[in-house]
Amino acid sequence: MLFVTYAGCFGIELFVHGVAASYYVDRFGLDLRGAGLAVGGFGLLALFARAMGGMASDRLARRHGLASRARLLCALMFCEGIGLLWFSSAQGVAMAVTAMLAFGMCLHMACGATYALVPFVDRKALGGVAGIIGAGGNVGAVAAGFLQKYIGSVQHTFTVLGGFVIAGSLCALAVRFSREHVTSEERRYQEALQQNWLLQSRELSTDSTGRSST
């Protein structure tokens, strides 16, 4: 399921980087410099939005449990799909750029939220799981490219991709964890908190001992 969700976020990102500049030139009459700046803003979102997706997933998991990670991913991908539909129907440059930045924010956060789930799928095969999910991004980009060739219109391709992403967001809800898995992860989390508390206590006691000796 995470293979599909990553195809719907990172795969779309790769596709957008490949066609968005020419889309702005052909549809809105922008020059290459303006189109490049618009697409560059989309790419710059990755500098912080991915981390935001991962951190939001961590915070929700601390408050509402492991299943909330999957629900967050579903919500981000759903908003991404809505943003793609908005982008494809935009009639002006300003509206198109706004829509692209909006769905781009959700897209990059979805990438981070996807990989926030990776360690909890199978700890014994963490590298394999990460590799398979990562491959989903490349498959998604290739599939989007073939879809664009089949449809012929980039604008209509974005519309169809928006629908696919909305449908793909349901795959995030299909990510389930057994009760034993949730209990095990909760125990690991509590043990990590306890170890962190003990480490901080030792550091404080060491500092106080050093100050008293001086």
Where are these regions (language model features)?
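Extracytoplasmic gate region of multi-pass secondary transporters
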Residues: 1-54, 111
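Intrinsic disorder in cytosolic terminal tails and internal cytosolic loops
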Residues: 177-214
